[in-house]
Amino acid sequence: MTNKKKVNLYKDLYAENSNYFRNLIPMYRLINSCINFEIKSFLDYGCGKSNLADIFYNMRKIKTYKYDPAINDYSYLDKHIKVDLIANCDVMEHVPEDEVDNIFEEMSNISKNIFFNIYLTRAETILPNGENAHCTIKPIQWWQSKILKHFKYANIVLTSYKNSVCIITWKISYYHRILNFYAFIINSFEHMIWKVFHYKLWK
């Protein structure tokens, strides 16, 4: 994202919420269920304060990278970097519409295999300037059309994340769709248990 004002808003947001952390084990489970090719390197593009790259390293022992322009430690992206897989989770809806194609183009130069998780509704998070964090809200078909301008495939897979869609840029077999379904069921069950536990805890 090249919009410096927008990037600075997210820097301010992270500063205001310094203890924020996002556990993406369920996301890893979804991504892993769809992988039908060898991966030796992974990039979390728009990583925020999540542990997705760390999970990939711990589970697969591969080279991992993090990139997020709003986090100083991860704000540099090597122009020559190439990886086997990119995860782009809860990112594109934060990108201004006039920058979407540029982001897709940049990622397509890094890898042909991208796992997108894109939210389709407004966010609960409000930026320091009063704007909703999700500035580009579009239907699934719009995102697929955009992705297909830069990648060969834009296949929808199951997601357990409410109000979002998962799209992958590689061909997936029926076998891996079954694995994806199992991951979806496990994530949904875990989420149900979590909701019941917290309801009883605070009742």
Model-derived features with residue positions:
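A conserved beta-strand element that flanks and buttresses the S-adenosyl-L-methionine
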Residues: 87
